[in-house]
Amino acid sequence: MTFIGIDKTIITILLFVVMIESTRAQTTDTIATRWRGYISLDQYSKPFWRADTIVDETIQPMRINGKINTNLLFKASAILSVKVANYSKEFIQGKDWELKDGQLKILPQSTIPFLDKEELVFKAFKPEFSMHGKVPGTHVLFTEKPYFSSLQIIVTYIKAKDEKWKGFVPAFANRNLPSSIAKLKSKQNLKVVFYGNSIEAGYNTSNFMNTPPYMPTWADLIIYKLRQHYGPQISFSNKAVAGKMASWGREQVNSVVIPEKADLVIIGFGMNDGSAHVPAETFRSDIDGIIRAIKKQNPKTEFILISPMLPNPDAIQSGIQSIYQSELNKLAEKGVVVADMTAVHAELLRHKLYQDMTGNNVNHPNDYLARWYAQIILGFL
């Protein structure tokens, strides 16, 4: 593999940091339940674009030019609660915050945590809190520890009536995923396999990080809701491995995925490919190779292809991720649909900060953005 424009040592580092915790794929068919007592998975899986009440939207309060920014996705008609993202504290209206012009405003005497913009990019290396920046000689704030969830806040609010989501919305795929939908509706056995990198493995979601509110990975959230709606006969296996690219997925598909005899495979490579500047045509060929290899053995298998979320533009991981969505669209056909998380994330970034939606400030989603992954994919099913 040739990495264009990036030092090989740095590439080794950036692929290593996403494998700090584990490189093992999930091998069990169970879903952790530690979230009970903190959150409702029914509320967490309700599509943001349909909900009147937005539950636990994440904000990273950010002081920019002396003003603390707190950007909600939608204007609010009422704010119901404001908490630390790790559920360690709830803040008081009139003391810590107020609603002004449809947005959350932090009051001067508030104890709500915040970051200064100047803390995001810096020159001096900070042990355990640094990643190479895209600009040579810089670093970006980064950690795989549950640091950001102690600084981010979650806001539950009632959306103003005229507020609408203007981004990508999935359509029920009864025509494009006919076999999977038919099995779900008739309550036949359905095997789902997840295949990808650290994002698909669930890195930086709160249960993965062993911190409240212990939200399951977005893959687990999908299975939870499918079982709730269609029945317990749905099985799954998560074969995602941190740090991997689509070329690895193609090389390993025969030994890793095909033996699972999946009815539906959800494929999510692209983040690491984009960091390594893998050409668009090569990326498409690798994904196509995965699909063809599986269909050769299991012709009725269907696929959901996920275009990658975007990396922090200040981090060295920021590459050509945004161009892969159009390549995946070229593979769409009956039995293959594309979940455009690239467009979803881009639309979110028109209204919110990158730090509102990240678990490591480089290339992993927090619970909030992970919920978008689950909701978008569930929208097809």
Give the residues covered by each predicted segment.
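Bacterial Sec-dependent N-terminal signal peptides
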Residues: 1-30
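Active-site segments of SGNH/GDSL-like serine hydrolases
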Residues: 268-272, 293-324
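Serine-esterase "nucleophile elbow" of acetyl-processing enzymes
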Residues: 25, 163-239, 252-261
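Extended beta-strand solenoid/passenger and fiber regions
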Residues: 26-167
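Charged helix-capping and loop-helix junction motifs
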Residues: 281-289, 320-325
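Solvent-exposed loop/turn segments at secondary-structure junctions
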Residues: 198-202, 241-247, 271-276, 309-314, ...
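Catalytic His-Asp segment of secreted/periplasmic serine-dependent ester chemistry enzymes
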Residues: 308-381
